[in-house]
Amino acid sequence: MELMGMSSTKYGGLEKFNRTLMEKSPQNKFIFVYVEDPMCQQYVDDMTTGNSAIEVISNKSVIRYCFSVICLILKFRPHIVHFHFGDEKMLLAPFIKVFFPWIRQITTFHSECVLHSLKAKIKCGLYCRCQSKIVAVSKGVQKEIAAFYDNKKLVTSYLGVECDVSKNKEEARRILEIPMKPIILTTIGFDVATKGFDVLVDAVAQMVNKFTPPLFIVNVVGLSKARKEQFMGIVREKHVESYFMSMGIRNDINTILSASDIYIQPSRTEAISLAIMEALHHGLPVVASNVGGIPEVVIDGKNGLLVNACDAEGLAMAMLDLMQSPEKRKEMGERSRKHSLNFNVEKGVENLIDIYEKKGVISNKS
């Protein structure tokens, strides 16, 4: 049972990972539990056939959510409960440990895990003690967890991504109705503050006010309608509307990346970025914040440039550097494509199945 602890707004990298996991392990039954109905019908169709099913439990009430999960456990009798997102897992894990001791628990830390208070460290440490295996999505996150829970149960496993790179830039821009001349800088994220989109706006404002960059457009992808309005308000405050476009939540990320020249990830915090992994597969150079697991996917000076989080001036200079040098973009893009081989979805799924089966979490005959 995969307790996602989140909603699914698109057919994104994590959704594709789940589908591949289901396909590569046909001998096992997977129950994916979300807090809202997934928004992409194609994903629902793909995940409700064969050995997979989707259940939806609202998390508006923590107690009701936990009770509903327990009901699902009684209904499906899973061999394993795999926690992903959501604070509710802190309550569920010890309950399952006591009342369903035959169930093996696994947790994946998809976010950075920097705990500042002793209380938070003790709470998270107790949660980790309930787990059979603790999976960090990057070495950076593993290091953060090891600061308060250094244990042999802790491993790093990259998720990896699936990419369709069949479209060339001309075809992709024609489909998206984007002109060929501008340099397209793309960034993908669900939240303005977490993903540092406000810093990106500040960086663009500084760049166009101090320099004369080549013709460019920044394409912001992944914001809901409300967050898109919030973001465009920041853009208007800086008077840089002509340099931005916002496509909202999309399922055609491969086409968008095929149409792009540079990928930007100015996050304040980031365990590791599936969007960057996708950009690497498309041969894009990357400008990103030097936080969390990002340095594992962006090698500074090789396939991209790293800047300090919230450093608008540094971000502006890095973007300008790549925009002014087509040759550097090409060289870094080629290195990105080679580096992307380390972040293949099938490899990530194989690692997780190995954790499930080899470590005795589930039998490959169950």
Report the location of each language-model feature.
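Short hydrophobic beta-strand element within catalytic cores of glycosyltransferases
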Residues: 285-288, 298
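Short His-centered aromatic/hydrophobic patch
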Residues: 83-91, 109
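N-terminal strand-loop element at the rim of the active site
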Residues: 4-64, 226-227
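Glycosyltransferase donor-sugar binding loop
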Residues: 32-40, 161, 188, 215-230
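Nucleotide-activated donor-binding/catalytic signature segment of Leloir-type glycosyltransferases, i.e.
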Residues: 231-248
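Conserved donor-binding/catalytic core segment of Leloir-type glycosyltransferases
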Residues: 1-3, 179-195, 201-204, 219
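Aromatic "clamp/platform" in nucleotide-sugar-dependent glycosyltransferases that forms part
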Residues: 249, 268
